[in-house]
From Swiss-Prot:
A cellular-component GO term for this protein: cell outer membrane
Matching PROSITE patterns: HEMOLYSIN_CALCIUM
Purpose of the protein: Virulence factor that plays an important role in immune evasion. Lyses human lymphocytes and monocytes. Binds to the LFA-1 integrin on the surface of the host cell and to cholesterol-containing membranes, which probably results in large LtxA-LFA-1 clusters in lipid rafts. Also shows beta-hemolytic activity on certain types of growth media.
Protein name per UniProt: Leukotoxin
Major localisation: membrane
Effect on the protein upon substituting K562R: Loss of cytotoxicity
Hemolysin-type calcium-binding repeats: 721-738, 739-756, 757-774, 775-792, 793-810, 811-828, 829-846
Amino acid sequence: MATTTLPNTKQQAAQFANSVADRAKENIDAAKEQLQKALDKLGKTGKKLTLYIPKNYKKGNGLTALIKAAQKLGIEVYHEGKDGPALTNGILNTGKKLLGLTERGLTLFAPELDKWIQGNKHLSNSVGSTGNLTKAIDKVQSVLGTLQAFLNTAFSGMDLDALIKARQNGKNVTDVQLAKASLNLINELIGTISSITNNVDTFSKQLNKLGEALGQVKHFGSFGDKLKNLPKLGNLGKGLGALSGVLSAISAALLLANKDADTATKAAAAAELTNKVLGNIGKAITQYLIAQRAAAGLSTTGPVAGLIASVVSLAISPLSFLGIAKQFDRARMLEEYSKRFKKFGYNGDSLLGQFYKNTGIADAAITTINTVLSAIAAGVGAASAGSLVGAPIGLLVSAITSLISGILDASKQAVFEHIANQLADKIKAWENKYGKNYFENGYDARHSAFLEDSLKLFNELREKYKTENILSITQQGWDQRIGELAGITRNGDRIQSGKAYVDYLKKGEELAKHSDKFTKQILDPIKGNIDLSGIKGSTTLTFLNPLLTAGKEERKTRQSGKYEFITELKVKGRTDWKVKGVPNSNGVYDFSNLIQHAVTRDNKVLEARLIANLGAKDDYVFVGSGSTIVNAGDGYDVVDYSKGRTGALTIDGRNATKAGQYKVERDLSGTQVLQETVSKQETKRGKVTDLLEYRNYKLDYYYTNKGFKAHDELNSVEEIIGSTLRDKFYGSKFNDVFHGHDGDDLIYGYDGDDRLYGDNGNDEIHGGQGNDKLYGGAGNDRLFGEYGNNYLDGGEGDDHLEGGNGSDILRGGSGNDKLFGNQGDDLLDGGEGDDQLAGGEGNDIYVYRKEYGHHTITEHSGDKDKLSLANINLKDVSFERNGNDLLLKTNNRTAVTFKGWFSKPNSSAGLDEYQRKLLEYAPEKDRARLKRQFELQRGKVDKSLNNKVEEIIGKDGERITSQDIDNLFDKSGNKKTISPQELAGLIKNKGKSSSLMSSSRSSSMLTQKSGLSNDISRIISATSGFGSSGKALSASPLQTNNNFNSYANSLATTA
């Protein structure tokens, strides 16, 4: 079997036209054997065709053309009166039809034929003109030749001459009914097909093409020659436009009247229309089969006739039209979709809709014709199965319908190619006129529509980041419709994977004019440069959707199969993105949508590093997923990894030689990151499939045995915000500001005065050397101040806080917390929840408020420890002894428990519970030192070591000492409680005022309150070495820098 390759380039189009006949052979071969058997059994006949002109029939150019055309074709012309008497046109009652049976054989009746021709305007206009007589003769000759060939084929199995002779001799021949039904069938077929085409010329041309194709097949030369003899019809390689016109006319009926009908409605209407069109044919087929049954002497009534009719109707299936209806639906949808972009100068969606409409027309026409053929074949097949017709007739009908279907299928591809070529010509004409790539213009139109909808979005970004300008780089990615049009028109090597645009919004009003020129000034997507050095005013740079890696695309089309082509993509990529920041204004740079990884065909990962050289003002940088170098310059600069897809961080400043210098390693294994990939779009043009490769992206995981990492270099960066994973921070010898963000983070400040934020997650934070501020945030955190005077804030959750060796402030926040002051004079504020507090060495201050939960205070050293009841009067509290513990109660609940208040330090007891806890939670490097310190304390009882808080102060400055409390309990021996009244009397006797409610305060109270204020101020002063001077960019989402200052002010007010 010959192999034919369809064209994918216009240079191959001419060769393709000559190969259509070969493809027709392939479809015909399947029916070849059956048809040969049928012809062998039927034998040859001696039929002839006569054109009958009745006496006194009007004359004119039309009749002249009929006569001359018939003579050219060898058709006998019989003039009534001139050539003999009137013919007996009543044989078989076939008179007054286009085709009948007379004593001279098959007869075309001139009045009916002339009337039929006159009904076709295209033909009748030519026939009726004297000046076009020669042309008219040719046209009529086409018609008569077509009918002659059609009749010769249809009656190849009938000896009509013998039938006529027998009928004239009065013999009762049962084949008479068969012949009559056959003529009725042929008349209906001719009428139906001509009414569908509405153009007898093109109808003749199609039969001529059928004959030419058959003429190239062995054993079909005789049949093919008859059809090829039609004059001036051209060869098979031409006339695709005419064929398209024929199919357009046929499909007009299938489109139906209601253009707004949905798919289901159209499918149903198509079935109804088909039944109407084929109704007479189905009736004629049924009559023909019943006549065959009568000829065999069998019954023609009842179930048999119904069976045949039902088989014929079942062959006409509405399902065959459903797919076509969907094509028209899509064509209508594309036309509607195109309206949005036509105003921006792009008509490609409409062109694509035209392709689906025109190819749908072809499919509709061919489906209609095949439905007719299927109905005929089904009816004959049903009769043949019931022994109603002879096997030769069944074989002949089957073979002929198969041949016609095969040739129609072969010609359909040629029609599709022709339609695609017409669209390609329109695209080329547009490009010649405007000097621009048509498909790039499509991307431009898509982006213009996007901008029309996005002004509000840009204003929202400007408000969010508090900058004057918004500069957005938008990647218009691969568009399936634009790609499909490129593939169908064989322009797959001329389309890009998309186009990147720069849009500039200043003060919420102006989008940059001459956007193409502006884009080129800012962005070079081939070299990988982004330059904002010419922008004035504070600016946000953002990427609204993922930007493809920098590089140049190259495409080449090759054939990959008989009907398959592939347009392969090669990218000459760059290894870096280089960004120049806004020089003299604040900038926000969001690189989280910048694609920095590309996956090759062999599954290797290529990385495009980002190098950002920023300006002299305050900058805020959101990092993407790939390796990044940030040279932040002067100003207060923040690098933020919190937008995700950055992997778990290890931030290391231990080897820094300058402030703000960090190395960052990121583990991307198991992290979803943006990856550039090569995707394929399949486009179909009939049997031909084109695969177009294009760059795409996906958000996916990297799983590798060795791990996949990114490496960053940060220079002149004042603040770093971590990722959503478990990060590790190692500070420098300079002042560091770290935010853990989400995840269970590990943060070490090391040297310098650091601000360390755990944020969300169960974090562990170590201040190291220097006066540090540690913020746990949400989660169950562990905070260690270590060296220096530190501020520790546990935040939400059940936290563990240790102050270290300086004067520290410890705030538990909400949750059930544990606070250990360790060495130095510390301030411990447990906050809400049931907390445990131990001041450790030094003179410590505890803070309690009435909204707090149950606090437990363990105190072992210092002789000037204080408890501040910040918003509670002493007159509202009572004390209760519970074993060796002292309970402070207010509002009938235990507010504070003083552990071991009534016990004395025991030198033989070894390490007490407090000391054991300290060792348990202390950093490993401090444990040996603390243990030796505790051991030195054993064996001696220092009066300065006790388990008491020496002074308790109410909100108005009223006070009571530990000695006062002990005295009240001692007077009664086994006394268990001290009432508010007893406390009131004690306080009254200690001061000069007559009442706790007096507006004047005793000098003693004022002195004590002043002492508390001084102590608090001293601790605040010690821990305020860093924090108030540090600032964060206004765009920072983590505004926690003022926590310490707010709390310090609150403490001062309380004191």
